[in-house]
Amino acid sequence: MAAFSAINVEPEENIDEEVDTTKDLQVDDALKLFQNALKLHAQGPQSFDQAADAYDALFESEIFKYPESKTDYERFEAGQDGTLATEPVFAQGLPPVGADVDGIGSSLPQALYLSHKNHGQFVIDRIKHKVRKSTKKREPLLKDAGVQKDAQRALDDFCVALDRDPSDAELWRKTARVAAFLKSARINRYSLEAAIELEDDPAVEEVDPPSLAEGFAGEQLKQQLQVLGDDMALTHPIMNPFVHREMPPYLARFMDPMPFLPDPTKRLAVKELRDTEIETARSVLPISIPSWSELGAAIVRFVTKEGLAGQGVLIQLPDTDEQEDVQMEVDMQLQPEEPSSQSGTPDEVVEAEEAVAEPPSEEATVEGLTSAPAPESSPTDEQASKDPNNSISTRKRSQSAAGIPDALEDDAADVKRSKRTRRRDTAVEEVMDSATFLASQLQPLQAADQNLFQTTKNLLENLGVTDQVTLGRIAEVLDSCAADDRTGKIQNQATVDLSHSITHFDEDTGAVLLSKRELPQLSLSAFLEHAKTGSQRAQEASAFDDSRGLKSFVENVNQGWNTIHDIAYKYVKALVKTYTEYKWPDQLRTAVIDVTGRLEGSIYDSFAYELELSPKDVQGETISELAGLAQTLFELHLDVYDHITDPNSTADQEAKLEAKCRVDRWADMAGEVIRLRTLEPDDPIALRFLWASVASTTMAKGTPRDHVLNCWHSLRDFLLGSAATEVNLVNNTTMPEISTAAAEREISKLTTMDFFLGLFQEDNGNPVAVVESLEPVLNPEGVYITIPATLKQADAGGDAPSDKPGKLPIAECASQELTDLWKFLKGSNTELRLLLWSRLGEAYGKIQYTTKQFSCFLRSIETVISDLESDDYLHSTDEPRRNQFMSLLKALDDLIIQSLHLALNDNSSFDIMDDDHLRSSMSALAKVSCMLHVAAMFEDETRIGMKPAPASTSDLRSFLNKLQEMQVRTWSLQYTMLKVGLNQHPELFPKPENDLADYLAAVHQVLGLRKCCKSSNKIFLKMMRVELLKQKNIDNWEDYLGQVLYDLHGLKLGVGIWEVQDHGCEPENLEKRQALQLVGKVTMLANRMSMKDLLKSDLKTTIERMQQAIGSAKSSPQMAHNLRNYSEYLKAPIHPLHLYQALTGSVDLDAVTINTPESAPAKQGWFFLLGMIALTKFKGVDLNRRQTPGATDDLRIGATFLRLQLQYTPDRWDAWFRLAECFDYELDESVLWTADKMNKERAELVKFQRNAIHSYIMALSHSYAWASDPAVLTSLEDDEEALYDMFHEFGMRMYSSSRSPFAMEPFQHAEQNRFFIEAEGAGTYKRIVHNEMTDYQVWKFAAHLFRKAMVGKPKDWKNPYMVAKCLWKMYQKPPEELDEKNRLRRPTVQAVIDALEKTIEVVSSLPKPRHGQDPILEPHYKIVSVVHKLVMRGDMEIQAAANVLQHQPYAPDRGQEISVVNAEDWEAYVVRCLKYLRDKDKSNWQHRIIMRHARILFDEDTDPSDNESSAAAKAAFNVLRESMFTKTMVMNVWKCDAERPGRHHVYTEQYIRYMVRVLDVMKDRVSLEAVLRRIRKKGADFYHFNELWQFGVLAYVKLLRRTFEVPLTEEDAFKTLSQEEFDTVGEKITAWSTTPAAEDNAALTAMKEAVEIKKLNSNLMKAGPIDDLITDCYSAIYLHVKPDLLDSDQQKLPHHPPGDPESKPDSSNPKSTSLLLHALITRDKDKDMTPSALSSLRANSEQPDRDKSERHSLAGDAPPRAASGRAGGGIRRPNILRKAEQAVQAVLRAAEMPPRSVGGATNGAAGGGKTRSRMGSVSNARAGGRAAGEGSGDESGEDEEEAEEGDVEMKDVGDDTGGGGGRRVVVERSVDAGTVKGAAGGDSSYEESDPEGEGESGDRHDHEGEGEGEMEVEQEAGQEEEEGGVGEEHGGDDEIGDDDETEEEHEEGDEGREEGAAPALPEPVMEDADATEEEDEEDEGE
């Protein structure tokens, strides 16, 4: 059966055979074990046990069980044929070369080889550890059987490893060494011969050893052959390189690979003697730290504790925890985490051991101490590769042996190489990519460095710095910026030393720079201390390794029996060898001095004993050694004596005498020993003895000064005559240098001692004397001697007589003493010169001569730099030079700090600096910058990974930070120098500020990229900020300042070309002082930006943070004065004269000047800027485009800042202008969204208007001066746009205040009357302060402002549009109301028409609106409206008017001739024009056009009884229904762009009045009811809402009377009834109202409608007219049913005449009694617990004021007819109203509910559907009435259809009290899942206030009809008064709220329905802004 083959898998072309990978897995497991063992092995002795277990596990792995893991010898011993057995195995295990890189072919041999080799080394390391840690003697330990066995195991491992790789020369050497330890000389010799005969053919030529291992092996073989005396073998050609050459000493010490093992093959065997030595107990001398210093201190402690005992002492070294060095080899291929391109055996580590196998001799110990440390050995270059065909195995494994295939073998390989192996091929490419990456990382840094140093070089050269050394140093740095090896270009020695101190950081060396700054000691002792050492090379010497050779010394001492005396002598003798060659550490020097002082006697005795036993050979080494020892001890004791005799020493006299004795004793001993030698003139020991002798003579008390001086002169002469070189004693402070120059310094010190004694006297407090003494010594170039005129004339030969004294440099006439001082200072060290400069600077500081003090600091810096370049420094050895460098670097740091402090904080620092001084100082600072730059380069390279970072320590980090701080201070100080230089040479630098700014920016970039700006407390950033703020003429200063502010405070300016970079600086808090300094620059930047852009930029955040730092301005008396005057001015009435005076700049306020810290920013407009930001925030969202009211907080904040600005600068017109804008915007916010404030809080609106107008007046007045000459005042708004905006907005404010809804109220001030004194007499009279401004004056002034605005903005159509409107209003003003002047200049019709046509011309010139935008229609509509009104007024002929309109762009037939004859044609033409404009209004924004159309069709002033009026009204109604009113009477009026805030509510009021009038004429009671319901819910949307509501209600009531023909009852129908009879009649009328006979009764229907409108009114207006209607309806009903009532009564009751006792109700008659009781009970029950159905639905916003609700109609209707408390004989009107309500409720219940049982109630769930009740509304009678039970099925259907609308339910429930006959109404409303329920008594009574307001009663439940037969119930908390004025409260539990919306509204979508919510929000009105609107003639009557 064929195998399955997937058709969607392509078969491979080359299918490799399956390979068994079991062996590979086993090899990988073994390698893991090997790596684990290797890791444990490398961890040191503490892991040796674990490493042993790991190696055991390794050798138990499967690979060591393979046949190929056995050696040839093992196979031979096993009886196998090596050749036949091996070939097939290796054929299977080793695939073709190059094919299996990581497989068994390469990994297995390597694993076997390395496992055995490293295990053998591990065994040797364990032996080494045992030897080190053992307290027994070495020989018995190494003869132990276990050690011998371990060594044999190591030898076996080495043999197996060599069987795998016989080319390992180093392994052959180790094998030979182990064999020598095991006393196998034959194996030793064989192994050494194998090591050097690997691949060399001796028959060809003599060859050199190719590696260091072979060289060592050859040298060892030569020594062994020499021991054996095998001269024949030494003649072999391969031995020639070793026989004829010697191994260098520094390599010979590394020749023995295992020096801890004894080597018996080094000498011929001798018979061993029996060891009979008996171990004796010795004292132990423990050492805590293995160092010479600790050993000396331990000796002193031992003597102090044990005394000078004679017991033997054993020195015990500490058990160090540090890991011992282990030798191991790891093939790089076995470490996948570190892939390497190299193959083969890596270089092996050669271990250096001081100890040797045999007990070291004392000479060996000394040799180990004195010999220089050997440099790291580097293997010599290997020979060229041999012939590949050579059958001899090469030492380096070939490519094939390593398993790496050639390029041509890849295709032929059977198995593809692994990814790890293939990555080796791309190593070179990766290195190249890495180099490119590093170069890209360095490129920005190098570019910044190059820019900075090139800028510095250019500036220095231009300033005249010609020092080639300085320029060369800068050139070095520039060259390094472009080089790969940047530090390789640096040649300066000081820079190299600094680089070395970083790369080889030492904590002790770094502590010099990191230590706290110590003030210089300006005393004589300090001077003497610094004067002891002269040459800078005195400290030359390499540092002594405190632990080198100590182990050998301890082993040597412990081998014999040595007391503490012997140990101390040997200790001193061993260290004296290094006295002149190495610089001892301070601890070691102290230890040696302590040992020589405490055991001086023992050392002296030991020395004398050794001197006595030594051979008296004058040229022997022993005598020379003893002479050096004696002289060294002499010098050490002399040094101790010098310190004891120091004036500051606290040693007692006994100590001084003892020290003197020691000096004398060792001086004698040294002299005696030296005399035993053959003396040479240049013998160093002799020179040292002579110098020490003279020094001791100098120290001796009582020695004459002349004698001492002669001794030094003699010594100097001797040194001059001898050929001796300079001798440096680095460990002696008394005589550190022996040379002619040092002798000269000592002589100079003696000769100048008097001068320095006077200089450093403790009581010398005269700084002037110090200046006069030191200035000639330190600065002779600046000191001149005044020569009298006579002497000057004599010198000149008398040719030029002059009376002026001359000046001569002091260098030309110096005295011998001064010359000696100069000579002394020239040879002195740097510390002394710095000390003197410091003394001079301190003296200048005391006399407050800052500039000279600053000069001293700079000279000190120059001194340090010159010393770093001196020959003494350059030719010093490394260690002392580097120590000296750190000391000078510390001094340099202190000097730079002091200099920078004076340069930045004292303006007089540079007063006396001449050009030469300036150039030299700048040159020195440039050198310092170049030197310190190496630290920055080092950090760059370590940061990006170019160089390995040193071990990170806190001290190193602190050291680098210190260098960073020095660099920052140096650049800062250099800037101050350059600034002075540039300002002194204006001819060379025409724009010095730009050059300085570029330099600062270059430094900032260099520091910022390295995150160094924060160094030195951000001193550079602070300096740069101050400098940038000072400089005025910098290009792109915002870029420089922006980065500085971001680094300092985290502020972003958001301007400029560059983006700010993160320089790693922690932002600081911005202080007030700093913020005030920034105000000028920040304000300048803000002025460059528009406010809209400013609000989006980072600069706004910066300004806010600055203001937070500045804080609020503290009030001052001056500020309070100004603010008080401003406040009083804003409250004052508007004076007409001030308006016209403002046009000429004559209005001003009384203000005083304010001088506070905030005055400076105020003058720069800071507070104005803050106010503008706050104002622009509010203006950011256009008023008319916001959907919700805006927060006025920003407005108030802006006004506050603007007022503050005006307190400081009262003449800023723009601040007044923006303050006026704030008032304007707050006014607009008050009237834009609601009409509440217009209706109730008009005083606040008047205040806003007056404040704005007053502010505009001040802005207009102060702008006059600015407009005349803009340079007079400094204005932030330097363009004229704001000025013309001010003209326009001022005009708009004036015009708006003159029109409704403000209606000239701001200009009326009748309430502000004052008393005036009569002209004649003493009386007074009261009148207003000045005349009020008329509306004509307002329009005239506004037109003038708009004309001024047109000058600046000719393309703004609003200005000419408003001019036209003003002219039209002025034209409409009746001439009789104007004065004579205004009547003469009253605008004409042509002027009005021209103004309108000008507006249309401007609009037509504007660009066409974009697609989807409507054109500007306001001017086009306005000219149609105005022309029509002119025609209607008769001021313009019809044809002329038509001609005018026909020429307009939007005429129906533009340009055509039309003929209009009469008024009808004219109206038709105007209507055509309006319709054409409406077609252009796609968005239906222009509601004025619609209303103008309707007004043309129907005039609301016409008589409604006219038949034509009804038709006209219907036509107008149809026009309005098209786009303004919906069928549910929802008015959709949108606020257009050109409509002023507040006008919308005026228009809505006018439109509602017009619609009410139209509906009244049409007798459309249903629509009128809907209109009333709409306006009742939205009282806040209508201006004069209370009057509007009263107007609508009265119209509706009148319409009800006319519709249902309800007569006005003049006579009360109930005047003949008593109260009881009235109650009985009321019950019967209520019962009759539910019968079918009552359905067609018009009075009943009218009464229901009246009750509903009364509920809707909810006491908003006086209910008199409504009550009259209800009373009349009830009376009509009574009169209608009265006959039936009488007939029924006569049938039931006997007739009794009036007054008959039997006419009274019979109490025994149960029916009569029950009727009466029922009426009384239900009435009382209703009063107590049942809320009336007439409750208030008035919303919070619709609550009228009490006084307003009591007003009568404003339409001129008569007040309700007067009535007494009772109707007729005893029936009060409230009782009639209550009975009428009961009747209406009965009708509603009968119409809405099916019959139900009295005892229970149902939810309507029975019957399968929810039956929803109907409460009757006015709409029930729309069809003329409907029977209560008619159409019950239809009602049920309607209930189901409208159930989702959350209507109310009314249900019959049983009486809670259990009484019969009582019913209560349960009103339910579903709210989501729940139901809110309330109960009301069925026979509830309703009491309404009488016309006189005697009392009010009734719950405020407003049931509004919704759709057909629907009713809405709104919840309203209320409190009613019972009759008689007694309040009657009803519980809130019975009040139920519902939505106020109709079903039609839900269908039309005009209003959203939200069940259970509060009263609905006002109708959505789309509002737009910022323009004007047209006014109609009809507005005048408002």
Curated annotation (Swiss-Prot):
- GO MF entries: nucleosome binding
Which compartments is it annotated to reside in? Answer: Nucleus
Gly residues composition bias: which ranges?
1801-1810
Instruction: List all disulphide bridges recorded for this chain.
Output: none
Instruction: List all Low complexity biased stretches.
Output: 1755-1765
Q: Does the keyword RNA-binding apply?
A: no
Q: Where is this region: Disordered?
A: 333-427, 1688-1776, 1791-1982
Query: Major place of localization?
Result: nucleus
Domain of life assignment: Eukaryota
| Composition-biased stretches (Acidic residues) | 348-365, 1832-1847, 1885-1896, 1907-1953, 1965-1982
Family membership, please give it. Belongs to the HIR3 family.
Q: What does this protein do?
A: Has a role in a nucleosome assembly pathway that is required for the integrity of heterochromatin and proper chromosome segregation.
Name this polypeptide is given: Histone transcription regulator 3 homolog
Q: Gene name, please?
A: HIR3
